[in-house]
Each structure stands twice: as C-alpha cells, then as structure tokens.
Amino acid sequence: GLDTSYLNRYGNELSGGQRQRVGIARALILTPEFVVCDEAVSALDYAVRNKILKLLIQLKQEKQLTYLFISHDLSAINQICNRVIVMYRGEIMEILPSLKQEILHPYTKALLAAALGFNPRNRTQNRILFREEELPIEPEGCAFYHRCLYACDKCKKKPPLVHHNDKQHFVACHLI
C-alpha cells in the first residue's frame, strides 16, 4: 500500500514511479470495473515501467478490471493487452488479439518494423515500410494513403471498411 506520508506531498515531490502508483491508487479508490490508462508507462525508465506493468497486470487479475490501454509502447501493449486496436490519424487500421499474431495492415507492419529498429540486435530486420513525407489526408480516401507503399487509386478515393480476416482479426485495407 501507500505510506500515509504521501497524503501531504505535492506531485513534484514524488518520483515518476511514485506518481504513477498514486495515480493508479486514485483511479482504483472508487472500485471501477473499467480504467483508461493513457500512456501510463510512457515517461518511466525501464525498471520502473516494468514494475508498473506488473502492478497493472496484478490488479487486473485480482480486481477483474478491464483496461483501455492507450500507448505507443508496443512491448507494453504485448504484455498487458488481450486485444489490440491500431489507429492512424483517428482511423482504425487493424484489430487483432495480439501483436504476436500475423500482422496484415501496412501501417501495423511499419510500426513493428520501427520498434524493431530501436533494438540493435534486430537492425537487419529494419526496413522502410512507409513513405517519409507527411501529406494532408485526402478527405474521401484512406488516412494512410500518402504514406503507404502499396496504395492504389482506390485507396485515394474511398476509405476502406474494417472487415473480418478471421473471427478475431479485422483490417481496414482495400488490398487485404
């Protein structure tokens, strides 16, 4: 639990990990069933991040919580989520049970390739999977059209619908 000395402390008097734990305690004090975790581990060093993830997983199991876990940290997503929704510019690109499953959407593939690129052991796997330039979204087309290496004319003119690939895997792409 938290020591009572934390009651009179200000946020700037706590470490990053302590602030996260206090935030978690504040969120859980009303015994919710659903908790939004928006970048819950983004500003933490690796050791503290892992402790917070373990705490969140433990609390999820003990209190049977449901999390909406919003993050750019693909490793954290892999550890805590049992369903992943990948979005680009507010549009759903892919819904899948795990990032360990076969990835179908070009944007999800690019995200994973970029994450692998930060690991020196995986540098040979790092390939450019999207165009570098960031152009305005075509209002009638796919949000990822300008950056996708596989985009066709249909992608520019019509937004793709999210469709089943299998029971738990959905993708929004004209080419899949």
Predicted features by range, described:
Residues 1-6:
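Conserved "ABC signature" C-loop
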Residues 10, 39-40:
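Walker B catalytic motif
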Residues 10-14, 18:
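Conserved ABC ATPase signature
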Residues 29-33:
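A short, proline-enriched helix->beta-strand linker immediately N-terminal to the Walker B motif
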Residues 95-176:
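Charged, flexible cofactor/metal-binding loops and thiol motifs
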Residues 24, 36, 52:
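Hydrophobic anchor residue at the start of the ABC signature
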Residues 44, 48-123:
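P-loop NTP-binding/switch modules centered on Walker-like glycine-rich loops
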